[in-house]
């Protein structure tokens, strides 16, 4: 997958679980890399030094994640394979504290591909409607109203997803028997 890069504003960095030196570095560009070993790594682009502890999610990530286009400290990343942790799914991660705010897509009964639920694509977020758009290899396009609440002054961030629309699409790889 592709790494993500972000130069966080000082106010945002102050609320993050970054190492103190990273919070203080004015020109820090943080590289965020979800890897095949189940970890998400956080690095200084200039030096390669870790900016915070890695986040273990326990799934293989082989596609590109996405950062929220509004500058909110949110990462959207989907697992590319099942693991000992369960069936592959999408993670919505709070980058202030590296907590998982929401997951979806695993074992979706709406899928044409049974329990297969890989998510190698990168997410889109419609900033105007606060809607996450995420295609899955399970043959479902997810449109999820996030109801994001972000207060940079207080350093708080949450999502309360509702109004989930699932659009089923058909193709060579969307049915169990045809792949």
Task: Please identify what each model-predicted range represents.
Residues 1-179:
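Noncatalytic, solvent-exposed loop/strand surfaces
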């Amino acid at each position: 997958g592709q790494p993500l890069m972000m130069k966080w504003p000082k106010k945002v960095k102050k609320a993050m679980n970054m190492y103190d030196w990273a919070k203080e570095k004015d020109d820090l560009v943080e590289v965020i890399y979800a890897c095949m070993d189940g970890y998400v790594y956080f690095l200084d682009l200039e030096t390669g030094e870790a900016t915070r502890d890695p986040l273990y999610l326990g799934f293989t990530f082989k596609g590109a994640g996405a950062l929220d286009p509004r500058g909110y400290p949110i990462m959207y990343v989907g697992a590319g394979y099942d693991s000992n942790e369960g069936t592959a799914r999408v993670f919505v991660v709070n980058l202030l504290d590296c907590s998982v705010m929401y997951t979806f897509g695993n074992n979706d009964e709406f899928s044409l591909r049974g329990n297969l639920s890989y998510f190698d694509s990168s997410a889109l977020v419609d900033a105007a409607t606060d809607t996450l758009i995420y295609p899955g290899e399970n043959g479902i396009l997810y449109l999820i109203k996030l109801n994001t609440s972000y207060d940079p002054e207080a350093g708080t961030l949450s999502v309360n997803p509702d109004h989930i629309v699932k659009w089923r699409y058909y193709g060579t790889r969307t049915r169990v028997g045809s792949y």
